[in-house]
């Protein structure tokens, strides 16, 4: 079986974000990216999946937990959803990067996104 190539998001201490290729990250890599604990990352991921906002990558390996099957890797859509749900310095830096890349660095749009984030929590 051919293993698919995957990439992770890299964030430096000065806030520089590097996203290259086909982003697929494990829960532990996501926790490291946002500077949070594994269990907290997993809890946020499950809440986002339950709300139907984003899903994991079921085309790669999966983990069975009782009768449920969870993907082992999550893509950019989940990472973006998490960045607007998690409150950490790294999540804030990633939100800024996302807004800059989307061409929406306007503070009014940023305030709107923060208010929607409050509803998610």
For each predicted feature, which ranges?
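Residue-level detector of alpha-helical secondary structure
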Residues: 29, 44-47
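Positively charged, aromatic-accented nucleic-acid-binding surfaces
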Residues: 1-29, 33-38, 63-121
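Short, solvent-exposed alpha-helical "recognition" segments
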Residues: 46-57
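Short, structured secondary-structure boundary patches
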Residues: 45-46, 60-64
């Amino acid at each position: 079986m051919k293993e698919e190539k995957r990439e992770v998001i890299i964030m430096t201490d000065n806030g520089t974000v590097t996203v290259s290729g086909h982003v697929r990250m494990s829960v532990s890599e996501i926790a490291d990216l946002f500077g949070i604990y594994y269990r907290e990352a997993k809890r946020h991921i499950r809440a986002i999946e339950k709300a139907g906002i984003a899903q994991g990558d079921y085309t790669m390996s999966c983990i069975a937990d009782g009768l449920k099957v969870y993907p082992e890797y999550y893509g950019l859509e989940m990472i973006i959803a998490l960045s607007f749900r998690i409150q950490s310095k790294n999540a804030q830096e990633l939100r800024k990067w996302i807004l800059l890349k989307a061409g929406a660095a306007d503070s009014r749009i940023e305030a709107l996104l923060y208010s929607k984030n409050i509803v998610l929590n």
